[in-house]
Amino acid sequence: MYLANFELKDFRNFEELKINFDPHVNIFIGPNAQGKTNLLEAIYFLALTRSHRTNSDKELIRFGSKFAGLQGKVHKSQLEVELKLRLTPNGKKAWVNRLEQKKLSAYVGQMNAILFSPEDLALVKGAPSIRRRFMDLEFGQINSEYLYFLSQYRQVLQQRNNYLKQLSIKKANDLVFLDVLSDQLAGIAAEIISRRIKYIKKLNSYAQSAHSEISGQAEKLQIFYRPSVKEITPDDDVETIYQKVITSYKKNRPNEIRKGTTLSGPHRDDLDFLINDKNAHDFASQGQQRTISLSVKLAEIQLVHELTQEYPILLLDDVMSELDHRRQSSLLNYIHGKTQTFITTTDLEGISWEIVKEPKVYHISAGTISTKES
């Protein structure tokens, strides 16, 4: 899979851009704050309809403009797909091959993209919300059902939390309605948790292999899904998970009513990263965090390929400077000949040119782009 051409209008600091990409390696070079990351963000947004930097689409529309537009042609092994997005302050619309999609879940997955940025170091030691967002972005683009259930979960969770708040301030007293909301939420939660467990098992296998290679077989990485409902085990089926979530709601009802919020479920779950059986959150050095993050990204590539039969597009946002030569070599060797790769950097020093053969180099300055031979 590769992005052959790309157009954008009024996105961040770019007024207008039309560009053809190399199917293999594309490098964006230039000083900081000129638009390199904005361009990668635009490509990522074309794939997932979400930014990795903000939850507000309004921030993506160039100042003074009424809307932003993105468009690109994706080449897959069996077909070509034209993708188009239009962002306004009131929402976004998506088209696939000029047909407007009624739901974004029908659009996401047409182009798979994996992003690796310095912020990914927070995957290990950052807040649980970072790891949940990682799961949702990754699994949502490889399984449309996951994306659907996630959307449904957020809606019902908001309803349930609102009703719990009403109960907490004595403005409501109908516990039967709370039971209805609890049953709905538990059913959706079970679908999400079941899929997360399944995909984390697969991701763990690929990440272990990559981590072993990068660390020279010196360390063993393990990734575990940690449900907030402690009774859930990796072997539970959807029905069993549902029953355990419902039981948790009943057990925690007085506390949830008192606090006015749902205290367990996918929105409270987490991931554990272990190095040689020790929790990396507590013990990992910065170098080990980099190796874990890199291993997870390489595992994502393999997971997408396993489930879609296509290698995703890889976006490397200013990470080459964060990796030493050994980790750079591991990354570039791993992706060589597999993925179309986009790299941002302030200069060309330090990149392993013996692996990156004949990249296409673009210079970016103040939201404009020009090409030159590497």
UniProtKB/Swiss-Prot annotation:
GO MF: ATP binding; single-stranded DNA binding
UniProt keyword DNA-binding present: yes
A Gene Ontology term for the protein's cellular component: cytoplasm
Binding positions (ATP): G30, P31, N32, A33, Q34, G35, K36, T37
Disulphide connectivity of cysteines: none
Gene3D superfamilies, per the entry: P-loop containing nucleotide triphosphate hydrolases (3.40.50.300), RecF/RecN/SMC, N-terminal domain (1.20.1050.90)
Compartments, as annotated in UniProt: Cytoplasm
Gene Ontology annotations of biological process type: DNA replication; DNA synthesis involved in DNA repair; double-strand break repair; SOS response
Alphabetical UniProt keywords: ATP-binding, Cytoplasm, DNA damage, DNA repair, DNA replication, DNA-binding, Nucleotide-binding, SOS response
CDD domains assigned: ABC_RecF
Protein name: DNA replication and repair protein RecF
Gene name as annotated: recF
